[in-house]
Amino acid sequence: MQGRRSAPISLVLGLVFAAMPALAAPPESREEAARKAAESWLALVDAGQYGQSWDEAAALFKSKVPREKWEQMVASVRGDLGEFQSREFLAMQYTKELPGAPDGEYVVIQFRAAYAKKKSAIETVTPMLDADGRWRVSGYFVK
């Protein structure tokens, strides 16, 4: 009798476990993957690791701005802003076209950031899907 009860329970458990992949989290959206890439890249810039931020940028970014020039430019801008304090996500939008850039896959992301010398700045970070299949930053602007 005991064997008869365990067979239906085993069958039910087998069906539950077979259905689990369907219950798993959906794959990460391209926008969320781009946002994670942008936030990781911004963390490098916030930490003053400007050379490493260039190393992690998209090939398009690197082709437009030499490493040394990037390090000088971002050091100057961040020096004027003062120490980084906080950042709040505002919005993001996927697009395949941007002015002055080749067609591709881009996500334009905006953050409100606070710095010691500028309490409310808008940062626009634009990751793109790079040739290696990874989202990498191709543009960064602060207003």
Question: What residue spans do the PLM features occupy?
Answer:
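Bacterial N-terminal signal peptides that target proteins for export
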Residues: 1-12
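Exposed beta-sheet edge and beta->alpha loop/turn motif
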Residues: 92-143
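Second-shell loop/turn segments in exported
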Residues: 25-28, 39-43, 56-63, 112-114
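Short, low-complexity N-terminal intrinsically disordered segments enriched in polar/charged residues
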Residues: 2, 21-49
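Short solvent-exposed beta->alpha transition segments
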Residues: 35-37, 51-104
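Bacterial N-terminal signal peptides
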Residues: 10-20
